Amino acid sequence: MSSPKSLAAVPTYNDGMPYPEMFVAPMRQELTDLGVRELRTPADVDAAVTGTAGTLMIVVNSVCGCAAGKARPGIALALRNHVKPAVVATVFAGADVEATDRARHYFAGYRPSSPSIALMRDGKVVYMLERSQIENRDALSIASELTAAFEKFCAAPITT
């Protein structure tokens, strides 16, 4: 009898092998063409989280349909807003497995999901849009929610 899979397991291709780069490259490019910085290693993730002054947005990109038709187009629309995060970065679930695991380490209290979008300040999540909040919405609705989050968390220092 096999053991149940961990909740932290990320979707992969071919019995745990990461998705082939030629398969995910166009999906990566949708975000990098917007100026989104790729975080391909755990060290890249750590550097972004600890080295960003202001708000950091980390997108957990994915091969799924809701990433293609909803999350990435919603992000593209939201990034047209005049107020946005100081740094926008991405990891790719199922491709950059270790980098994605490291990003999820910083998302304490949230279940692993892809796609998902986190806004962080001082190494802590201040806003999270999870897959369950993406998959039944359109890109305009996602963009609207993201721009509201940008206005709240990126426009001025957060006071607690």
Q: What is the meaning of each model-derived region?
A:
Residues S2-G54, C154-I158:
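N-terminal leader/targeting and pre-domain segments
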Residues R40, T90-F92, L119:
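Structural signal for conserved beta-strand scaffold positions within catalytic alpha/beta enzyme cores
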Residues T52-C64:
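Short active-site neighborhood of thiol/selenol oxidoreductases, capturing the structured segment around
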Residues V60, V83-R102:
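Thiol-based oxidoreductase modules, predominantly thioredoxin-like and allied folds used
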Residues A68-N81:
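Typically the conserved alpha-helix immediately C-terminal to a functionally engaged Cys/Sec
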Residues R80-H82, F107-R111, A118:
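Short, charge-rich binding segments
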Residues V97-S114:
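Short acidic (Asp/Glu) patches
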Residues R111-I158:
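Non-catalytic, surface beta->alpha helical segment in thiol-disulfide oxidoreductase systems
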